[in-house]
């Protein structure tokens, strides 16, 4: 049946009559929904769409050849003039098949991550030209879209007409929009701005029948550790309002292919409902099972779920807490504990709380004995620490008198409510060990209870050696970004493998069950009692995400081993011993090249006598090749001198975990990354980050136009008359195709501006590089990793300002507040992308910095370069 304007007018009258009747029933939600639908009916866009539909069906498809004039006149007689709708329409810049947003503020949607650069994607200089604005015009709609117009449900900005047929459902306040999937590093994460309408209250939570939902074999823990819930969401203007990650092709946590909630968007449908949480695992969307599907299939299931979406989720049971007050008196080492967490710097995903991550031996907290690792700080004196930033929490703890009152929430169960919590030890230790270990081994005997955990009321630091059990203990660790978080030594002549160092904040440290001097007996059932160092390292490296370790505390054996190593070191340093005699033997000789992630000067670190200096020292040229210009993220000299007068309140910042320690001496030291030498046949792209990067980029291209160039970006906007495809832009006809290419990681960075996509493709960068020019890229730090994945290793140079005054001196147009913000952004940038920088430069003047950048690019141009490898140390 053809859709005619008189039918739309009649529907509008019926809706208005129904709205009038509703004013007496007191249902504000339904009245608001109907009011929004009425506004859509009154919009000029809807009028234009109905006009097009009627023209198409009545005029173009009329087999009786009725005069167009009659149809047109009838249309205008049966439909009121535009000005009676009392709506204003903004200018349209929409091309074919792109509808125009009506009466909605223009917002910006980004594909890129939250980098330091939040400006709109440039069109060489400015993509927005006021002269291009055009008056309202009739939108061209394809035949496919026209055939669907009878079910238009509404409209929001940045959307396409993508209507859904929903029987017996009142049209919603907003229309479907195409989901915008951000460019993401592995694992992929998708924001669920997935379209659809409907106005219906969400029912109460329903517990899913757990018998019908089989447990995923990849998820740690027993059924007793989890709870299940059905959550029904109604799509809002921004879709469902959450982000997901995971899938069989891109596991989010270890090898677990489940689909996890990674972000709840403030103000979205999920946030308003209040039941969905970060780290929830989606088992089913309506009737579609998404437990063992690819990431794209999960996204598709959410897109096609309709306007009312039922999510069946699984989550770990919440942790019960005990609130207590703790009084501390500051000592020489201050309060004596470290913290992590806060808004924007979550220690546990989805949790903004401030957590204690380390108790410093000899400090006030250690002597008091009540605070433990994993305790949550709720308040300090009269200052609330809930929902505050990490910096605010640090400031509150620093600005305290000698007597400090802390309000603390102590967990009453062993593991915290996070996705990395290990499974229950008693239930997971079955036949696994016995299947791999001889029955004669004492490993098959019942294990003694492990030492007190990080949540035990007994402080581990207060236990003496005599109080620690010497029997085999079972420890379950979950590998993190820093690996397992400990170092091993030993493996010579069957003397055993010992733990020599535990990384602060790493999985081993947070577990609290391992200590220096532990002998590793087995890893995942592999007997290491007689293993060489290489065999032990291989067993740990290949143990997977969940690692089960049997360890024994053997401090006496470890002390003897340390003494042996000390004697060997003294012999090597005090005599000219030839390579191989008197040194530790390894069963397999191997050369390993590493890059220092800090400012390294070998002449200051190692003392060589006159006989061995000529063999062991590195000349300047080779040192520059092996060790990149990377600097430790620490306080400068001035700030260090200022803090010495109040050393008990000195705060050091851990660059890897934003963990603040209330101590006076120790700093977190970055380690090494494994590298390999590679020959490149192209000119490496150049990415300069930090203050004054635009000036440096412009100067490089101006001074060396034959060595530096820029690539041609892509866009979905229509080509202007004076533009040339391939010179000004690569004009993409299909927005869907560009969105697909973005999802397929063919772009190093992309964004949206004025409803059009802009992006820099890997292929565009490669074309410039293969022509023998360094491609200058004005992109964020995330693009460095994406280029590396594409085998285009960029020269990434970070301009590190010395101070706020240094920035103001180089750019006199900046006000002091602007300079401070620029400095803070630079520090955050360094902290986030330090390991990806090729070099860091500093200088008092722009000219000095520019000369350093030119020298670095010349040195790093190849043809032989050092590139990071996936292999961990």
From Swiss-Prot:
Gene3D superfamilies: 2.30.42.10, Guanylate Kinase phosphate binding domain, Helix hairpin bin, P-loop containing nucleotide triphosphate hydrolases, SH3 Domains. One of its GO terms (biological process) is protein localization to synapse. Residues 230-317, 325-412, 474-555 form the PDZ domain. It comes from the Eukaryota. GO terms for cellular component: anchoring junction; apical plasma membrane; basolateral plasma membrane; endoplasmic reticulum membrane; neuromuscular junction; neuron projection; postsynaptic density membrane. Residues 683-858 form the Guanylate kinase-like domain. PROSITE patterns: GUANYLATE_KINASE_1, GUANYLATE_KINASE_2, L27, PDZ. It is a peripheral membrane protein. It is found in: Cell membrane; Endoplasmic reticulum membrane; Cell junction; Apical cell membrane. Residues 63-77 have a biased composition (Basic and acidic residues). The keyword Glycosyltransferase does not apply. Residues 4-64 form the L27 domain. Residues 85-96, 441-456, 650-662 have a biased composition (Polar residues). Residues 62-135, 441-464, 636-662 are annotated as: Disordered. GO terms for molecular function: ionotropic glutamate receptor binding; phosphatase binding; protein kinase binding. The keyword Endoplasmic reticulum applies. Belongs to the MAGUK family. Essential multidomain scaffolding protein required for normal development. Recruits channels, receptors and signaling molecules to discrete plasma membrane domains in polarized cells. Promotes epithelial cell layer barrier function via maintaining cell-cell adhesion. May play a role in adherens junction assembly, signal transduction and cell proliferation. May play a role in synapse assembly and function. This is Disks large homolog 1. It comes from Danio rerio (Zebrafish). The lineage of its organism: Eukaryota, Metazoa, Chordata, Craniata, Vertebrata. The gene is dlg1.
């Amino acid at each position: 049946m053809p859709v005619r304007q008189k039918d739309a007018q009649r529907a509008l009258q019926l809706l208005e009559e129904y709205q009038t009747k509703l004013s007496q029933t007191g249902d504000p939600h339904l009245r608001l929904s109907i009011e929004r639908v009425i506004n859509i009916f009154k919009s000029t866009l809807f009028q234009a769409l109905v006009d097009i539909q009627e023209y198409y069906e009545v005029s173009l498809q009329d087999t009786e050849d009725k005069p167009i004039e009659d149809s047109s006149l009838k249309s205008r007689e049966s439909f009121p003039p535009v000005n009676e709708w009392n709506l204003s329409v903004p200018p349209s810049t929409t091309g074919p098949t792109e509808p125009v947003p009506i009466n909605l503020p223009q917002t910006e949607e980004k594909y890129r991550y939250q980098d330091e650069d939040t400006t709109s994607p440039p069109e060489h200089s400015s993509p927005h030209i006021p002269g291009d604005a055009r008056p309202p015009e009739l939108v061209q709609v394809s035949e496919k879209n026209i055939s669907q117009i009878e079910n238009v449900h509404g409209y929001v900005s940045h959307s396409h007409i993508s209507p859904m047929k929903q029987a017996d459902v009142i049209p919603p306040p907003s229309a479907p929009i195409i989901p915008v999937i951000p460019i993401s590093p592995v694992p992929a994460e998708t924001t669920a701005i997935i379209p659809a309408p409907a106005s219906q209250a969400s029912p109460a939570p329903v517990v899913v029948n757990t018998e019908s939902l089989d447990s995923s074999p990849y998820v740690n823990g027993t059924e007793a550790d989890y709870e299940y819930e059905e959550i029904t969401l109604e799509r809002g203007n921004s879709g469902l309002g959450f982000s997901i990650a995971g899938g069989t092709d891109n596991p989010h946590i270890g090898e677990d292919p489940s689909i996890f909630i990674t972000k709840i968007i403030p103000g979205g449908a999920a946030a308003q409902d209040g039941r969905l949480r970060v780290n929830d695992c989606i088992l089913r969307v309506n009737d579609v099972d998404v437990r063992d599907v690819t990431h794209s299939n999960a996204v598709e299931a959410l897109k096609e779920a309709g306007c009312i979406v039922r999510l069946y989720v699984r989550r770990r049971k919440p942790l019960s807490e005990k609130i207590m007050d703790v009084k501390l008196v500051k000592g020489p080492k201050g309060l004596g504990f470290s913290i992590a967490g806060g808004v924007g710097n979550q220690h546990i995903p989805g949790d903004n709380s401030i957590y204690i991550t380390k108790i410093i031996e000899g400090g006030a907290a250690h002597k008091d004995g009540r605070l433990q690792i994993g305790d949550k700080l709720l308040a300090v004196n009269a200052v609330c620490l809930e929902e505050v930033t990490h910096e605010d929490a640090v400031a509150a703890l620093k600005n305290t008198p000698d007597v400090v009152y802390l309000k603390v929430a102590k967990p009453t169960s062993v593991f915290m409510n996070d996705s990395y919590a290990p499974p229950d030890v008693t239930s997971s230790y079955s036949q696994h060990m016995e299947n791999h270990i001889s029955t004669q081994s004492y490993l098959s005997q019942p294990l003694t209870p492990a030492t007190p955990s990080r949540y035990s009321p007994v402080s581990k630091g207060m236990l003496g050696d005599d109080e620690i059990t010497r029997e085999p203990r079972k420890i379950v660790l979950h590998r993190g970004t820093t690996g397992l978080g400990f170092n091993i030594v030993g493996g010579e002549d069957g003397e055993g493998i010992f733990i020599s160092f535990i990384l602060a904040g790493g999985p081993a440290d947070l577990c609290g069950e391992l200590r220096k001097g532990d002998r590793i007996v087995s890893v995942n059932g592999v007997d290491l009692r007689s293993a060489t160092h290489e065999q032990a390292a291989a067993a740990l490296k290949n143990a997977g995400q969940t690692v089960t370790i049997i360890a024994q505390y053997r401090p006496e054996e470890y002390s003897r081993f340390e003494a042996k190593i000390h004697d060997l070191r003294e012999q090597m340093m005090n005599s000219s011993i030839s390579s191989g005699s008197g040194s530790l033997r390894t069963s397999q000789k191997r050369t390993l090249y590493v890059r220092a992630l800090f400012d390294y000067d070998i002449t200051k670190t190692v003392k060589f006598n006159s006989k061995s200096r000529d063999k062991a020292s590195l000349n300047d040229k080779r040192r520059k090749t092996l060790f990149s210009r990377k600097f430790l993220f620490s306080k400068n000299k001035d700030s260090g001198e200022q803090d010495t007068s109040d050393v008990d309140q000195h705060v050091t910042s851990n660059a890897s975990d934003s963990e603040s320690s209330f101590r006076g001496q120790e700093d977190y030291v970055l380690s090494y990354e494994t590298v390999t030498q590679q020959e490149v046949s192209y000119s490496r792209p150049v990415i300069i980050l930090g203050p004054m990067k635009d000036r440096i980029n412009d100067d490089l291209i101006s001074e060396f136009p034959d060595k530096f160039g820029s690539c041609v970006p892509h866009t979905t906007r229509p080509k202007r008359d004076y533009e040339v495809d391939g010179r000004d832009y690569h004009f993409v006809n299909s927005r869907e195709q560009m969105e697909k290419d973005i999802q397929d990681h063919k772009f190093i960075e992309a964004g949206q501006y004025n409803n059009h996509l802009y992006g820099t493709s890997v292929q565009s960068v490669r074309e410039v590089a293969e022509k023998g020019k360094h491609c200058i890229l004005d992109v964020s730090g995330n693009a460095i990793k994406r280029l590396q994945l594409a085998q285009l290793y960029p020269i990434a140079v970070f301009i590190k300002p010395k101070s706020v005054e240094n920035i103001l001196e180089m750019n006199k147009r900046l006000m002091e507040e602007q300079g401070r913000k620029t400095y803070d952004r630079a520090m955050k940038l360094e902290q986030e992308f330090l390991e990806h920088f090729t070099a860091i430069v500093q200088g008092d003047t722009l000219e000095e910095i520019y000369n350093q950048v030119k020298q670095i690019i010349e040195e790093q141009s190849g043809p032989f370069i050092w590139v990071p490898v996936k292999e961990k140390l």
